[in-house]
């Protein structure tokens, strides 16, 4: 069985790739360059994780997105919310809009679908999850359902996108990742990279962007030792 894993190098996609590995899929990973500030670190993480999982990694250039994106992920204008803001819907929605890249997931998953069909893979594994689905419309079960509906008409082999984390929040994802590492006797999570910024030291996170703050909270609430290095703890 073949599968494509959309692997940004972040915690969610790293754990999703572990899920695919645990289900005995022959994995190929794809990582996208959409002109994001953290590109270099994401590629390093994705390639390291792919190596550990014995998977080929392909970096796909969709840098044209940067030409029309006003996202902080492209411009470097990264919001830094307070801890208490993470569960405030209005403030989280504002932060979401500041980092929203136009149609990013639609573009990435469409390309991944073509890749999957081309190598006769039956599934695309994505790291879409419950916590991000609260504010990001392209992380919701409705998005997954309707995207798969389009694949019924857009691909001959009717490849399907799956999101094994779609019912999980970040602490649950961290916990699942640790369980899968123990089950598979692999070490992946410490090489994942969630930060919105491109810090000079490999795998070093800023600790102040929303993604870093959610990562910190995930390990803390899961009761798991956080292997991440942060500039600001």
Curated annotation (Swiss-Prot):
Binds 1 zinc ion per subunit. Its EC number is 6.3.4.20. Transmembrane segments: none annotated. Its cofactor is Zn(2+). GO terms for molecular function: ATP binding; ligase activity, forming carbon-nitrogen bonds; zinc ion binding. PANTHER family: 7-CYANO-7-DEAZAGUANINE SYNTHASE. This is 7-cyano-7-deazaguanine synthase. It comes from Methanococcus maripaludis (strain C6 / ATCC BAA-1332).
